Amino acid sequence: MQPDLHCRTLAAHTLKHFRALSPLTHCMTNDVVQTFTANTLLALGASPAMVIDPVEARPFAAIANALLVNVGTLTASRADAMRAAVESAYDAKTPWTLDPVAVGALEFRRRFCLDLLSLRPAAIRGNASEILALSGMALGGRGVDTTEAALAALPAAQALAHQIDCIVVVTGEIDYVTNGQRTLSIPGGDPLMTRIVGTGCALSAVVAASCALPGAALDNVASACCWMKLAGQAAAERSEGPGSFIPAFLDALYHLDVEAANEEN
């Protein structure tokens, strides 16, 4: 099936709901991106919480609006905490999102991520290599970098979405968002987004938060991708390199006006 281009008018409408709701988003993410992830959510209007201790993670996941599990700096004790949080979210019907960082490169995290799939994530966000590995169609990938184009992983994403009954996002130069039956494409962004640590991980947090919104999950998640792409483009226009890009990106998220960007394009 051919992907449809996501509608920016819908993304603008979804952003208004996102800012009004300010989803409380429980982020169990990796150590490298904690601050950037929290600031990204705050800039867009969400409420981040970085609760990681197993004793606290289980009850907190039940009261949050959404949960993110990012396995970038996975340890055995952190896996226990994540598993407890996901089980709690599952029982409470809290939508949770999996970011399977480098899942094809390391066996411990691969087995952990595959085990979590039985607890029905609302969304999975990864690059092409990660989605191919998680679907069982390929193993490998060099850490968080992708060795495949997003389009090459689209059949794997569609199959995984159909199998798990969730939304799968494959990110790249063009992002693809699918529920297994319908697929949306989101172009845009800027190469500078790949020259700093954490844009993909932060997107996963925004995807998680968007899953807390009412309405069609596919459209909400595609809107999240659109917001990040537009902010990346705007930030790149006023940046000289990676160092100035980060604050410009956060400012662009804070001031994001999807309707105005739509008129400019």
UniProtKB/Swiss-Prot annotation:
Q: Which cofactor does it need?
A: Mg(2+)
Q: Coiled coil located at which positions?
A: none
Q: Write out the GO biological process terms.
A: thiamine biosynthetic process; thiamine diphosphate biosynthetic process
Sequence positions that bind substrate: M50, G198
Q: Name one GO molecular function term.
A: hydroxyethylthiazole kinase activity
Annotated metabolic or biological route of this protein: Cofactor biosynthesis; thiamine diphosphate biosynthesis; 4-methyl-5-(2-phosphoethyl)-thiazole from 5-(2-hydroxyethyl)-4-methylthiazole: step 1/1
Q: Which reaction does it catalyse?
A: 5-(2-hydroxyethyl)-4-methylthiazole + ATP = 4-methyl-5-(2-phosphooxyethyl)-thiazole + ADP + H(+)
The UniProt keyword set, sorted, is: ATP-binding, Kinase, Magnesium, Metal-binding, Nucleotide-binding, Thiamine biosynthesis, Transferase
* Residues involved in ATP binding: R125, T171
Class of enzymatic activity (EC top level): transferase
UniProt-listed Enzyme Commission number(s): 2.7.1.50
Q: Which family is this sequence assigned to?
A: Belongs to the Thz kinase family.
**Protein role:** Catalyzes the phosphorylation of the hydroxyl group of 4-methyl-5-beta-hydroxyethylthiazole (THZ).
Its protein name is Hydroxyethylthiazole kinase
Say which species the protein is native to.
Answer: Salmonella choleraesuis (strain SC-B67)
What is the primary gene name for this protein?
thiM
